[in-house]
């Protein structure tokens, strides 16, 4: 696995990441055990970067990543927000961003 440094964070992450939309189970039934095994397999292959979003399984993907991170606190997790509302500029208020951020923080632990 190749790694790159994120200079501003003084962190090194894998150049390949794992997207976790499928772990949210919107796409099919994925047990928590299977989801965690998938994350562990990626970790064992050298993946240290994981991508998620607050809408993946209505936060389920973030919550599963939170459990994974208990075993791997050095994992780098990026989440996205802003897909819970109609995609119009006036829906993206500072208050909405604060609420979405807080919800993801709670989900991710």
Language-model regions, residue ranges each:
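Active-site mouth loops of central-metabolism enzymes
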Residues: 21-33, 81-98
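Glycine/proline-rich, positively charged
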Residues: 40, 88-109
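N-terminal binding-site loop/beta-alpha segment at the start of enzyme catalytic domains
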Residues: 1-76
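Generic beta-strand or strand-like secondary-structure segments
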Residues: 64-67, 80, 96-103
């Amino acid at each position: 696995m190749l790694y790159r440094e994120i200079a501003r964070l003084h962190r090194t992450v894998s150049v390949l990441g794992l997207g976790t939309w499928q772990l949210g189970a919107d796409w099919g039934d994925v047990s928590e055990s299977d989801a965690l095994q998938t994350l562990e397999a990626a970790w064992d292959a050298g993946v240290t970067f994981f991508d998620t979003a607050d809408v993946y399984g209505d936060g389920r993907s973030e919550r599963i990543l939170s459990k994974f991170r208990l075993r791997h606190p050095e994992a780098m997790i990026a989440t996205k927000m802003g897909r819970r509302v109609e995609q119009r500029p006036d829906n993206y208020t500072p208050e909405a961003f604060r609420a979405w951020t807080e919800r993801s923080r709670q989900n991710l632990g």
